[in-house]
Amino acid sequence: HALMPQKPAIFLDRDNTLIRDDGYIFKIEKFAWITGAVAALKRFHQAGLPVFIVTNQGGIGRGIFTESDMHNFNHYLIDAAEKTGGAITDIAFCPHHPLSPDPAMAAACSCRKPEPGLLFDLAQKWQIDLGASVMIGDRDSDVEAGKRAGMAAYLFDRGDLDQLAKQVMDRHFMAKTDGRK
């Protein structure tokens, strides 16, 4: 079978990039968008770019919440994005944390950012061209993961996500897709 052509995508951190985080967030009643997140997701969706979330969820490894809690929260997030005109194609997470009481959860892994394992996994699953893709997150570890995966990476200052999304679109995607300029 022929290989699917690879396409660019947007990779986003979850906590304090898309949604507000006041610690380990897993309860739906605490769900709140970051300023500009809804508009940014809509902007990416209208441009035909798949959006992926890559998130460290060390609260699982530390026993603060369960994988099931996180999946329920993520399903709510995906539904909320769709209801507001955006879309999230897939979410990849790392449950590990160096301070976990469980040695298996505390061991070094390839998925906890700044390691790029989650990015590579999603790229393989969805035929994504990482070299043409962008990573956005609020921590240096997000930017480092993106760079290690060969992507352009942006540090989000927790201001208005759509302002950064517009810059990313103008810099990386509009010039390539709009021949009228």
Give the positions of each predicted feature.
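Active-site neighborhood of HAD-like aspartate-dependent phosphohydrolases
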Residues: H1-F52
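Asp-based, Mg2+/Mn2+-dependent phosphohydrolase catalytic module
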Residues: L3-I10, S68-T89, P98-M135, R139-K181
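Short, flexible coil/turn micro-motifs enriched in small/turn-prone residues
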Residues: F11, V54-G58, A132
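A short alpha-helix capping/helix-coil boundary motif
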Residues: L18-D21, N56-G58, H97-S100, F120-A123
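Metal-dependent phosphoesterase signature
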Residues: L18-T35, I60-D69, K83-G86, D102-S110
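Substrate-recognition element of Asp-dependent hydrolases with the DxDx(T/V) motif
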Residues: A37, L41-L77, G86-H97, G146
